[in-house]
Amino acid sequence: MLPTLGLAKTHGDEHFVEWDDFSLAQASDRKPVTRRLHIAFVAPSRTVVDEFWRAGTDSGYRDDGAPGPRPKYGDDYYGGFLLDPDGNSAEAVHHDSVSERGRIDHLWIRVADVEAAKRFYETVGPHAGFGLRRATDDRAQFVGQTGSFSVVAGTPTEQVHMAFPAPDNGTVERFHRAATEAGYRDNGAPGERPVYHAGYYSAFVLDPDGNNVEVVNHNRD
């Protein structure tokens, strides 16, 4: 369905497939399947939302909400929803405030404790390019330059890896230091990881639900 949104495959092999800012990796015993994730991709028009949903249902994927207005999210919000083979929710969305710079409009993960998750993401947000917009007892929403990210009360999303861009290596180091000094679990100290590409400089920590959160500087011109 992603080609209907203008997302071209940028890498693909038997273990890993990438479309610009979004990628899939083969699950293993060490890295189990991601569950209960919601991801919404930017659609340039309502017609493209319709095409995304139709391509998915025509291919046999499960409908999770036919294309149409969703006024509870916004007066001009128009989305269509599908379920991937692992039961994760994939949406194409168009609204007037949609970013033209990003491919992903928003991401939702479910968490065991909204307040605990909110504290974690407030800690790392200044170094990951996002900040808190609003919070209630059952949801906290963070926004960045190209989209939003929410933590929502419910059975926790499992095995998600999220990587946020950094403008320099120092930001990567500050992200890791802020998180670990606040007591969050280290999952990879700042350093270059040439296995991904030359200049790839990143660090990893785990959020309260065990999801892998990364900040990375690609060191590309």
Residue positions per predicted region:
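N-terminal beta-strand motif that seeds the catalytic metal site of vicinal oxygen chelate
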Residues: 39, 93-119, 129-131, 162, ...
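Core segments of cupin and vicinal oxygen chelate
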Residues: 1-23, 108-148
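Short, flexible turn/loop "capping" segments at secondary-structure junctions
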Residues: 30-33, 99-102, 154-156
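A short, glycine/Asx- and small/polar-enriched loop/turn
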Residues: 20-23, 33, 75-77, 143-149, ...
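Short beta->alpha transition motifs characteristic of CBS
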Residues: 81, 91-98, 197-198, 204, ...
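Vicinal oxygen chelate
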Residues: 40-86, 112-115, 163-209
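Short, charged/polar, Gly/Pro-enriched secondary-structure boundary elements
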Residues: 25, 30-33, 88, 147-151, ...
